[in-house]
Amino acid sequence: MTKNNETGWNLDNSYTTLPQSFYTEIPPTPVSSPELVKLNHSLAISLGLTPEELKKEAEIAIFAGNALPEGAHPLAQAYAGHQFGHFNMLGDGRALLIGEQITPSGERFDIQLKGSGPTPYSRRGDGRAALGPMLREYIISEAMYALDIPTTRSLAVVTTGEATYRETKLPGAILTRVASSHIRVGTFQYAAARGSIEDLKSLADYTIKRHYPEIEAHENRYTALLQEVIKRQASLIAKWQLVGFIHGVMNTDNITISGETIDYGPCAFMDNYNQGTVFSSIDTQGRYAYGNQPYMAAWDLARLAESLIPILHEDEEEALKIAQDEISKFSVQYENHWFLGMKKKLGLFSTEEQDQPLIEQLLKMMEKYKADYTNTFRSLTLDAIENTALFESPEYKDWYKLWQSRLKRQEQSKENAYEMMKNNNPSIIPRNHRVEEALEAAVTNDDYSVMEKLLEALSNPYAYSTDQEEYCIPPAPTNRPYRTFCGT
């Protein structure tokens, strides 16, 4: 671990303590003329880094992969994954972990360069990234952070001065991603597929030490590890559902063991409430539709449980039973998180038998009348009537009376209920059309002011500020569905 005192780099790379089959050491591929286009000042400070130093040419070279900070140990991680249900051996095909930054408070965060060049896992890809998708990940990951949803974060984006070729010629870029770690369900699948129980134990022990040290002394720490990951994912997916976030590519290599949201390729936020909403251009069967996300999370976690079977118990039948028992708990945990979150969105402090039907009735009406998900809860929070089909319907008026009656039966005042709603119903989300508007200005016109204004608004989604109102407006009706792409 080496500290550069001027900038604040304080890097280690504990991942190299794992067997070498889990990674390949490889330097980034230099680029011709890097330019810093976005730096996350507040994140830099929390990591113990000095923003003004990071803007200097020598530090920009680090974000571009043209230089390495003291203590860096670049490597590409190996992992596997079920991609749309099909198992593949994978790995970092266009990203490098350069090290782990130890913060002033002693926390450890991966520093990864995304778009840093080809690796042994590139599978004929160029290892590069385009500017638009990297800025998109920056915007949405920071919006998720502001929404209090566990997520990887974005420290910087640099342009490379080189073209990247996808369907068309695009400006190249590199994103510096920050994560609690990049250990995935797919990392455990990779270990299990290779067949070495010792390697699998090494990975599990490393993961426990890094993310769940409180279970190190547990009688069966590998069962406890599975339990903890299930708990975190149940909470995470409920938080996605509560704000209308659709990940789009919930492959097992995109499910983190830390419980953070990762990979913002084809993700988007729902406008009109619909359980079947899909944005990803490659999800033609709706596998990862909004309403399917809890089920797909359970499916992914079952793949983790399968991978752990060799170390859950020496008797395979008993190990299988343990795995099945633990996975069966996910749905109950998820439902509890979701129900509690929905109650908060409606200002309900206590629990009554009719709360679940009250919630379900509202959601059915929202789907029937194609109501905007975020704005419906925003209007309820403000106790305002919108000029929409939902609010003008007789069903809604009847429902509203039931809801108001329910609020009156609480010990807490209506003012307290509305305050809780305000803290749980975001006034704004990164609406797809506003994100596209910001990306178009930045990528096509080299105008980052639109993105900066959007990021400022998204940084406090529960403020209910008049300055944010323009970002509350849904997109104009269109016959063309919004489509997202993975960026690779």
Swiss-Prot record:
**Cofactor(s) needed:** Mg(2+); Mn(2+)
Main EC class the enzyme belongs to = transferase
Q: Name one GO molecular function term.
A: AMPylase activity
Amino-acid positions noted as binding ATP in the UniProt annotation, renumbered to this chain: 91, 93-94, 114, 126-127, 177, 184, 263
> Does this entry carry the keyword Transferase?
yes
Q: Which residues form the active site?
A: 253 (proton acceptor)
Enzyme Commission number: 2.7.7.-, 2.7.7.108
**Catalyzed chemical reaction(s):** L-seryl-[protein] + ATP = 3-O-(5'-adenylyl)-L-seryl-[protein] + diphosphate; L-threonyl-[protein] + ATP = 3-O-(5'-adenylyl)-L-threonyl-[protein] + diphosphate; L-tyrosyl-[protein] + ATP = O-(5'-adenylyl)-L-tyrosyl-[protein] + diphosphate; L-histidyl-[protein] + UTP = N(tele)-(5'-uridylyl)-L-histidyl-[protein] + diphosphate
The highest taxon in the source lineage is: Bacteria
| Positions with a binding annotation for Mg(2+) | 254, 263
Q: Which UniProt keywords apply?
A: ATP-binding, Magnesium, Manganese, Metal-binding, Nucleotide-binding, Nucleotidyltransferase, Transferase
Q: Which HAMAP family match?
A: YdiU_SelO (MF_00692)
Summary of the function given for this chain in its UniProt record: Nucleotidyltransferase involved in the post-translational modification of proteins. It can catalyze the addition of adenosine monophosphate (AMP) or uridine monophosphate (UMP) to a protein, resulting in modifications known as AMPylation and UMPylation.
What is the similarity comment for this entry? Belongs to the SELO family.
NCBIfam families in the cross-refs = PRK00029.1
User: What protein is this chain from?
Assistant: Protein nucleotidyltransferase YdiU
Q: Which source organism does the UniProt entry give?
A: Bacillus cereus (strain G9842)
Cite the source lineage: Bacteria, Bacillati, Bacillota, Bacilli, Bacillales
